[in-house]
Swiss-Prot record:
Signal peptide: 1-23
Organism of provenance: Mus musculus
Protein name, entry field: Serine protease inhibitor Kazal-type 1
Annotated positions for site Necessary for sperm binding: Y44, D45
SUPFAM superfamilies, per the entry: Kazal-type serine protease inhibitors
GN (gene name): Spink1
Length: 80
């Protein structure tokens, strides 16, 4: 019985430590939102967000970020 308890506690400790190494680091650049005051131009210049969604342009991404707690970054220019 003692061996089983020690084994389970060891496995639990190992899993809790290993959980930190599996977190994915999201990389990208922050959208330039200084021009996004009144509205966005209707120019299709797509950007791919770190959330996997294609936004029509960087300005649209800025307006979406205003609704969020955690901002979406630009993963790359062009569609996802």
């Amino acid at each position: 019985m003692k061996v089983a308890v020690i084994f389970l506690l060891s496995a639990l400790a190992l899993l809790s430590l290993a959980g930190n190494t599996f977190s994915a680091k999201v990389t990208g650049k922050e959208a330039s939102c200084h021009d996004a005051v009144a509205g966005c131009p209707r120019i299709y210049d797509p950007v791919c967000g770190t959330d996997g969604i294609t936004y029509a342009n960087e300005c649209v991404l800025c307006f979406e970020n205003r609704k969020r707690i955690e901002p979406v970054l630009i993963r790359k220019g062009g569609p996802c």
